[in-house]
Structure formats: C-alpha cells, structure tokens
Swiss-Prot record:
Residues 113-235 form the MPN domain. The keyword Zinc applies. CDD domains: MPN_DUF2466. Keywords: Hydrolase, Metal-binding, Metalloprotease, Protease, Zinc. Zn(2+) binds at residues 184, 186, 197. This is UPF0758 protein alr2351. It comes from Nostoc sp. (strain PCC 7120 / SAG 25.82 / UTEX 2576). InterPro entries: Hlx-hairpin-Hlx_DNA-bd_motif (IPR003583), MPN (IPR037518), RadC_JAB (IPR025657), UPF0758 (IPR001405), UPF0758_CS (IPR020891), UPF0758_N (IPR046778). A motif (JAMM motif) lies at residues 184-197. SMART domains: HhH1. Coiled coil: none annotated.
Length: 243
C-alpha cells in the first residue's frame, strides 16, 4: 500500500475500512487501524490516512520505545505535537484507546463464582491489567468461590511492589473471606513469574494451610496477558489447599 496516496485513490479492496469489513480487524496492520480512526491524512508530504497512521507510530516509537505502549498513556497535547494530528484526530485516537482499556475492565456480577483463571482475571483487570506501577491485590471469595470483592493491598514502583504474607492475610481475614486468589501485575507485560514471585507464593500457600483459608491461585497480569502460577508450577502439590 502506498502511503502517499489518498484513500480514495487506493483500490477499493485495499482500503482499510473495506478490508476490515471483508476480512475482519485482525488482518489489518496497526497503521491501517489508526487510519480508520483518523479518517483523513496529511501531515508531512501530504500523507494518506494510512501513511499518517504509520508516521504517528514512528513518532511514538522514537528512542526505541514501543509505540503501542506509548499510545496507551499518551496525552492529547503529546498527540497534537505530531504534524497532521489535530484535536479531532487526537480525540478519536484517545477515545478508541480508552474504549479498548474498558473492554478489559469487565467485573463479574456480585456473587459470581470464580471458577477459572479467566474469570479471576476479569474481576481483577480494572485494578491490575493496565497499571504503570506494580500492584498486589486479592480476590475475596466465599466457601462456594463466589466473589465477595477485590482489594488492592500494596502499590509499588514501575518495577517492584512490596507485599508481605502478614498484610495479605490480615486483609483477607478482615474482609471475612474464606477462600482467596492473589494477583499482581507486571507493567512490562511479561507475565513470567520471577523467583521472588515463586517464593512469595510458597509462603502464602504455607500460611493458607495454617489458617485454613485456601489459596486457589496466584495470577500475574499485564498489558492484556495473564499467567496462572497454579497451572505452571507444582507448588499446590507441595502445599495442598483442600479445595
């Protein structure tokens, strides 16, 4: 696709909107998705909407940054510093970004059973999934694994959070939960557990055994990804929870 052409000059079957209607959004390049939001082009060299979308990504990706990571937190003023992006285009982009975030912020209805990592992630997403700082949170459950609530225990830096078993269990007991799932986020989006994550999980499982409050899982979330430590470790075999 030629980025200097107007959308009207591109063959119909190659235009982003028509390709989305025919093949679905997954086949479109990121610049094409942005082009649909922009509607029109311009900027340096009178770019097409697709060209302007590509140029925007290049500008956001300067200094070896991930352009999509920058886009998630960009401000209107920052977008409008890019040639060709005025208030109308900036607000369209930011509205789409916010809508995308909110689709990950669905919370189950009260008393919904949490019967899978996916259900737990849905309940925790608003607190953890897109945060810039590491957070540690708990899902508070009743004896039938029904959701009583969520609670953020600690907020750390961009690279670490501090959570102790004492703080975690104190909140669980205070809230009257009889079962729990713990979770934290990795702002980088890499949801592989660190040695510290494994050790904390070990301590929590041992504490849960002593208190008789089953720990059902430890989840790591970040940038749309998640990982269940129960699914990828043998810790629950070492510390059975009676669940």
């Amino acid at each position: 696709m030629t980025y200097c052409l107007r959308i009207a000059d591109i063959p119909t079957n190659e235009r982003p909107r028509e390709r989305l209607m025919t093949h679905g959004p997954k086949v479109l390049a990121t610049a094409e998705l942005i082009a649909i939001l922009l509607g029109t082009g311009q900027g340096p060299g009178k770019l097409s909407a697709v060209g302007l979308g590509q140029y925007l990504l290049q500008e956001l990706g300067k200094n070896q940054r991930d352009p999509l990571a920058v886009l998630r937190e960009v401000t209107p003023a920052e977008l409008m510093q890019i040639p060709g992006i005025g208030p109308a285009k900036a607000t369209s982009i930011l509205a789409a970004v916010e809508l995308g975030k909110r689709t990950f912020q669905f919370r189950p209805l009260d008393k919904t059973p949490i019967d899978s990592p996916v259900a737990a992630v849905a309940a925790l997403s608003q607190d953890l999934m897109w945060q810039n700082q590491e957070r540690f949170a708990v899902l508070l459950l009743d004896v039938k694994n029904r959701l009583l609530g969520t609670q953020v225990i600690t907020i750390g830096t961009a690279t670490e959070t501090l959570a102790s078993p004492r703080e975690i269990f104190r909140e669980i007991i205070r809230q009257g939960a009889t079962r729990t799932i713990v979770a934290h986020n990795h702002p980088s989006g890499n949801v592989e557990p660190s040695p510290e994550d494994i050790e904390l999980t070990r301590q929590l499982l041992a504490g849960a055994q002593l208190l008789g409050i089953p720990l059902l899982d430890h989840l790591i979330l970040g940038n749309g990804n998640h990982q269940s430590l129960r699914e990828i470790t043998t810790l629950w075999n070492d510390y059975p929870q009676g669940d």
